[in-house]
């Protein structure tokens, strides 16, 4: 049985005081939530502060990106081992905004995936097609390329610490959401690609999250789908009550 994951990507929001206010509101709202893995991903500058606030709670800490080398002359970068040192257990890699604005490629995403896994982090590995690619019927081609490139060189054992997040780029921050059927179709395909590249056991066990305008109003329908194992939440994770509602989708 795959344990659902609800992860909040705070993106470039929340100063230290705002982040503390948010987690302090969130903690009591989700403390009794069972059967779900909860993750929040603040900006780098507040990771240690948020980690201290989360001590003894059921909420895991993630970073929004990492670099592929452990150390070196890479101005502005943060390594996986540094994230671990800051108290992170998870890291988001390959988000479409990183691909779009910062030139992430399947190759650089793969290097980051491997570095994070070997440092001991669980990765939230993001994939997804643009509106143009969907309209050109390229969705499955793009997803297979991204998965194949992203998990190249990753062992079956390491794959246990990989969570895939499917985020159709056209649904991120637009208010548009894939229908339940569209999301399930993509998730089923993704699981099939993992089976083809690895094996059926790995495919059955890997958790695949949906991301793209997930809200309290649509989470139940998405989570009712056979191959959807959770959500990577953007805007709705910036308010404690809406994120808690998503975390408690099964209640």
UniProtKB/Swiss-Prot annotation:
GO molecular function ontology, one term from the record: triose-phosphate isomerase activity
GO BP term, pick one: gluconeogenesis
PROSITE patterns for the chain: TIM_1 (PS00171), TIM_2 (PS51440)
Catalysed reaction, written as an equation: D-glyceraldehyde 3-phosphate = dihydroxyacetone phosphate
Annotated residues for binding of substrate: 9-11, 173, 213, 234-235
Family indicated by similarity: Belongs to the triosephosphate isomerase family.
Protein name: Triosephosphate isomerase
Source species of the chain: Geotalea uraniireducens (strain Rf4)
